[in-house]
């Protein structure tokens, strides 16, 4: 049996005595997409911060390739190959594409104290990596990031993460602020990252998008894992109902039906 690339076992997190996460266990394999589903307040953001090294779990363990790890900082998580791309890509609108791609790891030319940022190398690599993900409209590494569409900014951030060796790619609501065509392109990019052997964790409340790309699904409700299933084991309606609270949603539907009948 293949060892999961990333495994969480019994992870809980408390803040001042309040449980934000309770006993979360998850696995994600290389070349697979785990969709982490949940409504606002479900605990998704806290779980992202634990996996990316911003928070330490109160209890529980994290393993990379079967080996226990203890993240003291986001740098520790990054060194283990975990990259997180947030909703707006973490990009810089007033930078060129090449400069933004290499922030903190700039290629240089020259010698000793006379080293300078190698804009051409940076731009060429950034354009090449973006085009490998299907962003063919970007041909100039000097183009300002602010001129890119939302989907292109997401592609830039994803391409950067993969280029710098991400084995686990956490995407936090990557399609939330995008139109239909832009969202579709981001979903295609997710599948391309999957094909490269990257383990993708797609954090979303959009069930339709999750079902298009996901291999494995977990639903969080109020900090607990409410369900864990594979592709094809649940219908979209079942997942939506679970996320909405099941009985609570049924009660609301009955109440609205009664109001319509009384109108």
What is the predicted function of each stretch?
Residues 2-263:
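Glycine-rich phosphate-binding loops of nucleotide-dependent enzymes
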């Amino acid at each position: 049996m293949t060892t999961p690339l990333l495994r969480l076992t019994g992870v809980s997190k408390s803040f001042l005595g309040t449980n934000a996460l309770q006993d979360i266990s998850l696995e994600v394999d290389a070349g697979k997409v785990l969709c982490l589903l949940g409504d606002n307040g479900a605990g998704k953001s806290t779980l992202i911060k634990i996996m990316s090294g911003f928070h330490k779990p109160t209890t529980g363990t994290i393993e990379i390739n079967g080996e226990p790890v203890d993240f003291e900082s986001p740098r520790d998580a990054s060194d283990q190959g975990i990259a997180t791309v947030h909703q707006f890509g973490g990009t810089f609108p007033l930078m060129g594409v090449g400069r933004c791609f290499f922030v903190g790891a700039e290629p240089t030319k020259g010698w000793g104290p006379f080293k300078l940022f190698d804009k051409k190398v940076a731009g060429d690599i950034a354009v090449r990596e973006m085009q490998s993900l299907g962003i063919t409209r970007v041909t100039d590494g000097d183009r300002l990031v602010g001129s890119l569409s939302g989907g292109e900014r997401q592609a830039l951030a994803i391409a950067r993460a993969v280029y710098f060796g991400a084995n686990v790619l956490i995407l936090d609501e990557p399609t939330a602020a995008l139109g239909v065509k832009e969202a579709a392109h981001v979903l295609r990019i997710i599948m391309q990252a999957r094909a490269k052997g990257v383990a993708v964790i797609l954090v979303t409340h959009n069930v339709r998008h999750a079902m298009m790309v996901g291999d494995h699904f977990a639903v969080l409700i109020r900090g607990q894992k409410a369900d864990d299933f594979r592709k094809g084991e649940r219908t979209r309606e079942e997942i939506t109902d679970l996320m909405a609270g099941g009985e609570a949603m049924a009660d609301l539907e009955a109440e609205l039906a009664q109001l319509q009948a009384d109108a």
